[in-house]
Amino acid sequence: MDNDGINADPMELEKFSQLAHHWWDPNSEFKPLHEINPLRLNYIDEIIGGLSEKTVIDVGCGGGILSESMAARGASVTGIDLSDKALKVAKLHLLESGNQVDYRKITVEALATERPRYYDVVTCMEMLEHVPDPASVIQSCARLVKSGGWVFFSTLNRNPKSYLYAIIGAEYILRLLPRGTHEYAKFIKPSELAHMARSAGLMESGIVGMTYNPITKVYALEADTSVNYIMAFRA
């Protein structure tokens, strides 16, 4: 936590705020997010038995790529973030898409106090590796979900392969991401994520890896969790 008690890194917020106007450009720095979004959307949809009529909170929603796609499948979605610029872009895009998402600037910790046991589904994608205290985020996500509900986290594994692929490969060689997007020390092993989630009262339900083929330039969900992965938990 910073000195104001907010679980956010000001440098991380500024980094993504500077790129906010590119969120919905599929050929920008956010191209990987656009390309993996159908994969993670379908995974969530399948695991929970359909998003339609579910109440969903998207924690760290950024410009709203996942939030909007879940709303388009019939979910009642709230998206929260601490970047004013990203939220402005997200709200403006709703005018173009016609989707309905309630975007708010609030910490997940504060929302968990405001709306405990409120949501059927909690998603927190590509966020844990960017905050000072990921355990606090996980605990708050666990507080937000209804009993029997679902919580999804996606992040990066921490090992030599993930450093090679996610930082050296993605940021320096293939230039899929801007340099400095990730900090290796903040990567989280699946065992660490599972431990933090269990401590928050969640039960692990499944894990799937997300891979990228630099030859075909195609992302896929596979059993290999050595770099990117998504974990599903039940409350």
UniProtKB/Swiss-Prot annotation:
Gene3D superfamilies: Vaccinia Virus protein VP39. Pfam families: Methyltransf_23. It catalyses: a 3-demethylubiquinol + S-adenosyl-L-methionine = a ubiquinol + S-adenosyl-L-homocysteine + H(+); a 3-(all-trans-polyprenyl)benzene-1,2-diol + S-adenosyl-L-methionine = a 2-methoxy-6-(all-trans-polyprenyl)phenol + S-adenosyl-L-homocysteine + H(+). Keywords: Methyltransferase, S-adenosyl-L-methionine, Transferase, Ubiquinone biosynthesis. InterPro entries: SAM-dependent_MTases_sf (IPR029063), UbiG_MeTrfase (IPR010233). Pathway: Cofactor biosynthesis; ubiquinone biosynthesis. Its EC number is 2.1.1.222, 2.1.1.64. GO terms for biological process: methylation. O-methyltransferase that catalyzes the 2 O-methylation steps in the ubiquinone biosynthetic pathway. PANTHER family: METHYLTRANSFERASE, UBIQUINONE BIOSYNTHESIS O-METHYLTRANSFERASE, MITOCHONDRIAL. This is Ubiquinone biosynthesis O-methyltransferase. It comes from Nitrosomonas europaea (strain ATCC 19718 / CIP 103999 / KCTC 2705 / NBRC 14298). The lineage of its organism: Bacteria, Pseudomonadati, Pseudomonadota, Betaproteobacteria, Nitrosomonadales.
